[in-house]
Amino acid sequence: MKSWWPKALKVRRAEGQPVIPDVASASTPARFRGKPKIDFSRCPDGCAACVEVCPTGAISANPLTIDLGACIFCPVCTETCPEGAIAYTNDYKMAATSREDLLLREGCEITPEACSREIRRLFGRSLKLRSVSAGGCNGCELELNALGNVNFDMGRFGIEFIASPRHADAIVISGTTTQAMAHALEATFEAVPKPKLIILFGACAISGGIFQDSDQLARDFIEKHRVDLYIPGCPPHPLTFIHGLLEYLRKSDPAPAAGAQLLPAVSPSLWNLTPLKSPPC
């Protein structure tokens, strides 16, 4: 019987490094539809072709604006525009800390603002997430599940999903937030100890997506609670989530006051810890 490991080593060598070392400079496939790019010079006055065909009403005219919180990243607008003014790039960096920042218009850049120094002190090195699927199609949930695989390995940043909301620091909401999930969503959020964060993952969670006009939605939770981070997409790419969350947690705040005590930077040596010995019985 031939040994399996020579073939396994050959395959491993051909595949290369599976983990993405730097999520800020990672590249996505050319076919990936990321942040749209608008050439405003090619958009004629009075043309509303893209507005009329958008299935979620994410595009508005005068001035031309694309709402990434409602966009499902379908190619209909790019195929319909007679001047080719709209095109998708493979840029996955689209997370934002306010709903208004998801409005893509001329002269606007999308970038998460820094969290408060207290949030960074508490969660900068360890952030536990509780996922709540509030009426999703499982597309977003599949991408959230991929965050823990060998490629993205979100755990190396101290960020991971856990089962109990009582041990969580934030909830990640995917899906449209239906009436059937309204009570469960509220109860889960109440179980998370303070301070806590809310992250909306995907177009359905942010705006209702293609189901925004359904009478089965219950958006009261989104309207009455402050959302800390928006992750657009349908579904969002795992890199969009990781990059947006790291930008939110690790961006530098303005210079601290004299004598202020700040959390020191994480030393790489801290990750090379030796396992503890088992205590005697």
Q: Residues of each region from the PLM?
A:
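Iron-sulfur cluster-binding cysteine motifs and their immediate structural context
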Residues: 38, 47-94
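Ferredoxin-type iron-sulfur electron-transfer modules and their immediate structural context
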Residues: 1-53, 57, 111
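Fold-independent oxyanion-binding glycine-rich loops
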Residues: 40-41, 68, 89-91, 107, ...
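C-terminal functional extensions of proteins
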Residues: 213-281
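A common structural microfeature
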Residues: 33-35, 126, 169
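Generic secondary-structure signature for well-ordered alpha-helical cores
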Residues: 55, 121-124, 142, 149, ...
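Cofactor-cradling patches in redox/metallo enzymes
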Residues: 142-144, 149-152, 156-243
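Flanking helices and flexible, charged tails adjoining ferredoxin-like Fe-S electron-transfer domains
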Residues: 1-6, 10-17, 23, 79-165, ...
